[in-house]
Amino acid sequence: MNIMIFDATPHWSGGANRILLYSKELKKRGHCVAVCCLPESGLAKRIAEEHIPVYTLNPKSDINLLIVPKIIRLIKENNIEVIDICSPKFYWVSSLAARITNRTVILTRNVPYRKNGVKKQINRVLYHTLVDHIIAISDKIKRELVEDYSLPAKKITVIYDGIELNRFKQKRAEKIGVTPRHYVAAVISRLDENKGLECFIHAIAEITKKIESIQVIIVGTGSIETKLKELTQKLKVSSSVKFMGFRKDIPEILAGVDITIVPSPEEGMSMSALESMASGVPVVVTRGCGLVDIIVNNRSGSIVEPGNSHELAEGVIRLLESDYQQAGKEARAIVEEKFALPRVVTQYELLLEALQKHKTLTPES
């Protein structure tokens, strides 16, 4: 099958990682995969390294009709059968190109993107008339789509992100920069406003009052990095927090931590949380994260209310004071059962084959 995936994420992200993993696995299975993404994006570089065809376009706006002919040309030149659109900037232009060329088009929703007012009505037209199917990466996102847009549930398939399990080992390594008596908690995230990180820094101030022997590592870069560092100074927790910048050795880092935290008020699924669970490390997530349907609260992780630093602190303390190593084992078992890359890519293949079969039977649909 000839598949083209569209993405407009400028930075490396969980969504970009999902596209990379899916593309590699689909290529291994004999499919012809191409990716269209932003010039100079992290995804463009990583896809090219895997010798997968990559094309770069920048729509600049959600409805830039001037770019539609370029997308049509890419579709025809590569004999594309299925178009998978993963970013809003490509939703309209790629859907229109797919409709003009009578190709199967799906949208992959990996973050909530809940809208109101005019934007909600515009999206309703898109979802009901221009796309053949929608993939949601969590049950939570599917529920919200059905609720917000009155979509039939059968038009949405939940396919989770996939994990390369062999990259993540449960064997514990030496803890990062601390004595064995210390707890190590990690956040692995883009350091941006929407990630709940300021709330988490406030939670650290509360956590350290009860658990002095804790070291928090924050892995990632972003627009509010300086602001977060200043906040740790203001709250007098800088000695307990280590900013590690962007890192590629995530499996090695996770092997040396006890728990991870995803403080985002809204998160589709969180690749960093899945990687943590694959490493046998339990996670604290908010109810805004798609993992609420996966984690068993107080058994394989901890679930807290979003935007509440006290609740976040209590969730971290509760997990560390429990048998968090057993919670990590249960978290790993969940990932093995539901998120193994071959399993989820098979689900993706079967969906695309079914959509193509329907397209052949009803070519004008």
Name every feature range the model reports, one short phrase each.
Residues 246, 265:
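Aromatic "clamp/platform" in nucleotide-sugar-dependent glycosyltransferases that forms part
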Residues 105-133, 143, 150:
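A conserved, positively charged/aromatic
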